[in-house]
Regions:
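Sec-dependent signal peptide recognition
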Residues: 2-10
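Subset of outer-membrane beta-barrel
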Residues: 20-417
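Generic cytosolic/nucleocytoplasmic N-terminal low-complexity/intrinsically disordered segments
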Residues: 1-2, 214
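Hydrophobic h-region of N-terminal signal peptides that target proteins for export
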Residues: 10-18
Length: 417
């Protein structure tokens, strides 16, 4: 085991000179509990956090195969799901949108007045702004404030020892800039990531397993788009054109990058396990970016007293990770790497005579801290076929935790079993 950890560390250090962030899958379950998941991985989330966790499917909660963890809710079938979701900082988005609309009306009125009076439009605009300082205050309040919006689609399959996924993650980050004379709308880094990945896990013992996976990733991005506020109505057409370019380019296979993921998992005691993973070890640049591998270590605690493996099953996990250890952008404050959280999942309606595998209604609540910022989430599963999920977390846009928070709200609908 020490040799495996040493191998993971040496691979990570050898690639620590890389700089950019890899395509990131946003797991609703993981993000809601602070993204501390490298040692939880008891279902399909092992595909994204630690392939070694695939060895736990149909083992946790299985008295015949692993009696020590028989108290844990069993996942006999694994997972096969289709997910679609979206996210954004909606509070700031709507506020900034209203400011932009107000400015559009103002500039259109100024343009009409300048034409009617035969005056210079810029001079009349400056006079108008000087007589309405509240508008300048509004502009300054949202000057270069990013408003990232995300969309995601996943197709996932996970069974004991094997898992794979095809997923797409897209993001656009519009902002309002005060400008030197005229404010304008900008879009910073419009991108679409497409990833196909799969891997397997092997349990050497009931307590120790390793996992390895491969992935192919494609990224298309547009760095900067600027739109004059006087032509604000054209932003929708412009973004649609950029989106069409991105979605067509995503199937250009010449620029696909291939990578590997590694993971280990060890059940230290009956209720306590530790895990480590080195993910996103790419062999070439991705859309011109050198990718920083993600080295994460963590633990998970599942107390027997709070877990219940019956028809009315209950799952309780507390987890803590030191995540993305090689990311130099987060090393100014070491605690920005610290993620921790807990989750409680309770079956509310069960089918008489059946165990947790066939349930009518299940509720999951989670909370935690990701890099110092609070996270939370809720999900409702109906007949094990339809799951509605919501999560919120924050990303740091500055150099250290607390400097510039970006609050994300994401919703998702999931179909499958």
């Amino acid at each position: 085991m020490k040799r495996l950890f040493a191998t993971l560390l040496s691979l990570g250090l050898a690639t620590a000179v890389f700089a950019a962030k890899a395509p990131t899958h946003h797991s609703m379950r993981g993000e809601s509990m602070g993204n501390a998941h490298v040692a939880v991985v008891d279902d399909k989330e092992a595909i994204y956090y630690n392939y070694a966790g695939l060895s736990q499917i149909n083992r946790l909660g299985n008295y015949a195969k692993r009696p020590e963890q028989g108290y844990y809710p069993r996942n006999f079938l694994g997972d096969a799901r289709l997910n679609i979701g979206g996210a954004g900082p909606f509070e700031t988005y709507f506020a900034t949108y209203n400011v932009a609309k107000d400015l559009q009306v103002l500039y259109q009125n100024v343009a009409d007045a300048a034409e009617a009076l035969g005056m210079n439009q810029n001079e009349l605009l400056m006079d108008t702004l000087s007589s309405h300082p509240e508008l300048i205050h509004k502009i300054n309040s949202y000057d270069h404030k990013y408003l990232p919006m995300k969309v995601k689609f996943d197709a996932e399959l996970a069974i004991h020892g094997f898992g794979g996924a095809v997923w797409v993650d897209g993001s656009v980050a519009p902002y309002l800039d005060g400008g030197l004379i005229l404010p304008f709308l900008g879009v910073d880094t419009f991108y679409v990531d497409g990833v196909v990945q799969g891997g397997f896990a092997y349990g050497f013992t009931d307590n120790f397993s390793v996992g390895i996976g491969a992935k192919a990733a494609k990224r298309h991005k547009v760095e900067v788009i600027t739109i004059d506020i006087l032509n604000y109505a054209s932003i929708q057409d412009t973004l649609e054109d950029r989106y069409d370019d991105a979605t067509h380019s995503i199937f250009d296979f010449e620029s696909i990058s291939f990578g590997l993921d590694f993971g280990v998992l060890y059940q230290l005691t009956r209720e306590f396990r530790v895990g480590a993973s080195l993910r996103d070890v790419y062999f070439k640049e991705l859309a011109g970016d050198k990718i920083t591998p993600n080295l994460s270590v963590g633990f998970n605690y599942s107390p027997r007293f709070f877990n219940k493996n019956t028809g009315y099953a209950r799952k309780f996990n507390f987890a803590c990770d030191f995540a993305d250890a090689l990311n130099s952008d987060r090393n100014y404050k070491p605690l920005s790497h610290l993620n921790f959280g807990l989750e409680v999942e309770q079956t509310l309606l069960a089918w008489p005579g059946y165990n947790n595998e066939l349930r009518a209604l299940s509720l999951r609540l989670a909370g935690g801290f990701k890099g110092g910022y609070p996270s939370a989430g809720v999900s409702l599963e109906v007949l094990r076929v339809v799951t509605l999920e919501f999560a919120t977390w924050a990303e740091e846009l500055g150099y250290y935790t607390g400097q510039d928070e970006e609050r994300i709200y994401m919703g998702q609908i999931s179909l499958g079993f």
